[in-house]
């Protein structure tokens, strides 16, 4: 079983610390092969180390998705759990990222955190980018930066979900966004890495998704994957498939 666990809700509907999932609830989770800890921003939780420590009793692999802003907290956690995965959400090059994220120095904080983790010898680290009209032209340039740093580069497309408390996440210029995904696919296929070839297939599938066509990779939510919200409720889906 794989799981995605949101331990801090979105900025539009922030969860209250006293209402969020507790360590006692986490202890009741089943065995899992993979766990993604996300948010909001997970590193706002001051007990994140305790959460990770408990999850490693149940999960073979853990990845935390973060904006990379809390560098000291991230580094401190990674010193105790060097096997953990860290994916820092960077939404484009510096100006684009900071406009989308609303953080004046967000890009430099995220990029600086990635560099620091790499200097520490962390292996499972990389970028995560949600592609939309505003940042699609930065898709290949950001991939090249991650490639030069020897890091993973994960992508998804802008979408809606009741969980986001948002229904206006729409890609308007679909041909332009699709073209930039196509450029990324071509870059990935030039690699000698079979893993990047599979990434190319996934990103090719995102072009289908943008145009409202059937996904190439089916959604496995509720079959071997589940989602836990900040309040400990188990959800079988978070977005359209």
Report residues per predicted region.
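Conserved alpha-helical substructure of the radical SAM core
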Residues: 3-4, 8-84, 162, 177-180, ...
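Radical SAM enzyme [4Fe-4S]-AdoMet core and its adjacent flexible, acidic
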Residues: 16-21, 54, 58, 80, ...
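Conserved Rossmann-like nucleotide-binding pocket used by diverse enzymes
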Residues: 1, 36-38, 126, 154
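Residue-level detector of conserved catalytic or cofactor/ligand-binding positions
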Residues: 1-9, 234-241
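Short glycine-rich loop/turn motifs that provide flexible caps or phosphate-binding loops at active sites
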Residues: 1, 38-39, 67, 91, ...
């Amino acid at each position: 079983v794989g799981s995605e666990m949101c331990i801090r809700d979105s900025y539009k509907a922030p969860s209250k610390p006293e209402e969020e999932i507790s360590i006692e609830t986490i202890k009741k989770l089943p065995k899992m092969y993979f766990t993604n800890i996300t948010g909001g921003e997970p590193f706002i939780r001051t007990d994140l180390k305790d959460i990770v420590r408990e999850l490693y009793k149940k999960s073979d692999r853990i990845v935390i998705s973060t904006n990379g802003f809390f560098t000291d907290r991230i580094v401190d956690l990674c010193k105790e759990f060097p096997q953990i995965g860290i994916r820092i959400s960077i939404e484009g090059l510096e100006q684009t990222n900071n406009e989308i994220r609303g953080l004046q120095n967000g890009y430099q904080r995220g990029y600086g955190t990635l560099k620091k983790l790499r200097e520490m010898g962390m292996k499972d680290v990389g970028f995560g980018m949600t592609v939309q009209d505003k940042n699609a032209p930065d898709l290949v340039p950001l991939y090249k930066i991650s490639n030069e740093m020897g890091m993973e580069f994960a992508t998804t497309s802008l979408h809606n979900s009741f969980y986001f408390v948002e229904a206006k996440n729409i890609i308007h210029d679909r041909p332009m966004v699709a073209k930039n995904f196509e450029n990324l696919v071509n870059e990935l296929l030039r690699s000698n890495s079979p893993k990047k070839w599979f990434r190319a297939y996934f990103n090719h599938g995102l072009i289908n998704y943008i145009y409202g066509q059937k996904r190439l990779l089916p959604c496995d939510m509720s079959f071997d994957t589940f989602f836990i919200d900040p309040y400990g409720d188990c959800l079988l889906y978070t977005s359209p498939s």
